[in-house]
Amino acid sequence: MAAFTIRPAIPADAEALCTLHKAAVRALCLGAYSADEIEAWLRDREPARYRHAMTDGGQIMLVAELDGVVAAFASIRESMLFGLYVDPARGRGAGRLLLAAAEDEARRRGAAVLKLQATLNAVPFYRKHGFKRQDRSTVRRGGRDLAVLDMTKTL
C-alpha cells in the first residue's frame, strides 16, 4: 500500500480542497447535522476561499496526498486548527497523520496548546488523539448556527 505524503497546500490545490471539503461534510456529517444544516454550511464554499486562506488569510494549509491525489487537508493559524477534512473514499489514516503534522506545525510556531471547534461527528476522533472538551458552542455557516464542541490539547 502506498504511503501518504504530507506537504503544504498550494493555490493550485484550491479546486481539489473545495471538492474534498464538500464530499467529506456531506458523507461524514450527516446524522450529526441535518441535510439543511449541511447545505447551509457548504453554501459559500468556493475554490477562491481556499486560495485566499492560503495566500492572504494567514492560515497554513497542509494536505495529505496518496498517489498524487489530495486525500485530506488541514488548516491552522497560530494555535487554532480551523479544519481537518478527509476524503471519505481515501481515509486509511490520513486524518491521524495530518493531525500530527498540524500539531507539529503549531509547536514549531510556538503554540503550547492547540484549540479547535469540533463538529459533533468528529469529537470521538479528537478525543482519541488527546483533545479535551472545553465547552459547547456554535459556528455560523450559511446563515445557520451549527453546534460544535470547543476542544483543546496541550502540545
Where are these regions (language model features)?
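A short helix-loop-beta-strand connector motif used in the catalytic cores of GNAT acetyltransferases and
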Residues: 45-62, 80
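A conserved beta-strand-loop-helix scaffold within acyl/acetyltransferase catalytic domains
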Residues: 74-79
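A short, internal acetyl-CoA/4′-phosphopantetheine-binding micro-motif in the GNAT/acyltransferase core
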Residues: 84-91
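Conserved acetyl-CoA-binding loop-helix of GNAT-fold acetyltransferases
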Residues: 91-104
